[in-house]
Each structure stands twice: as C-alpha cells, then as structure tokens.
Amino acid sequence: MSEPLQLIGRIFVSREQLAHFNAHVIDSSQRYDDWGDWLGGKQWYGDSSEAEVVAGADCGQRFEDWFGMFFKEHELWPGAGEFMKIFGVAFNDYDDEEGCWKFMVFEFSENYLDFMSAVNALRQIDSMPGPPIHGQLAIVPYMFGPGFNACEVVVTIADGKSTLSKQVTPEFEAWATHCFETLEFPSD
C-alpha cells in the first residue's frame, strides 16, 4: 500500500481575487494543453489512458465547495476533518500581512485522478482578474518519501498563467519545510 502525498501551496493574491476564485465554477481540464508534460510516462492503476485521466478531473462545481471537502469530514473516519484542523495537518488561511493564501492537506491522496482534479482546480487561479498573481503549489511525498527532491507535480503561477514542473523554488521549499516541521501530532 502506498502512502498519501501532501498538497501544499502559497499563492500571492489579493483577498478580493481569492474571494472571486472561491466563488468561481471549476472549468474543464481541457482549458490547459500541457498535461502530457506531467502525465507522460506515468503509471496508474487500471487501464485508463492519459486522455481519460485528464478528462476525469472534477469540474462544474464551485471551487470553495470542492476545496472545502478537505477541511470537513474525511472518509477515513468520523471526525478526521476536525482532527486535521486541531493538530495543524490541514490549513486554508489568508495572511493579510503578506497578501498570501496558504494551504496544506497533509493526507491528500495517492491517486492520479485526485492529483489531476486538484491541479486543474487550483491552477485556475491564474485567470482571476486584478493585480498579477504569483506563487506555487506542490503535491509532494514529504513525510513518506524523498520530499522536495521528488515532487509529483509543481504548479508555478506567474504572469497570468500557470505552468507544470517538478521543482519548487528555494523560497517555497524553505517555507513549506517549515510548515511540515512545525506540525503537531497527538501523542498516545
């Protein structure tokens, strides 16, 4: 059995742009044409083609509703969502001082369809009107793997577009590492 990867992001965006983003309806993954750069050569369970994985991304619901599910009840066990908030293993906050949206889902997923849905939904912040938005998000095997040396995917947002890569910036890595290192887990 594989372990779930972590989803973490820091996006410099105005509070108004974030509110607009939260209210927008997630568009089809077909709006981007660079999925093959990331998914090419990957392996997943089942016989789905790359095109089927791309087409399988969640769309058609408000971003706030879709993303909010990670901070509520999880299917793992009753109360998991509250546990994640209490012990700092999930957060979704706006920092007014930095003008920055920060989020983490510690036990995100190990499934490419989930990865695809998250990357498609989150990268759509690149099209919000207003001041330039920039930042990064990553799906990374931080706790159960080699960490930032082997990111599953990185989304870099700059100049009104988002691009997919495998490497975070040193600044993002330092920030995210600090977030992971300051997690508090309950003791038995």
Where does each model-flagged region fall?
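Charged interaction segments
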Residues: A51-D188
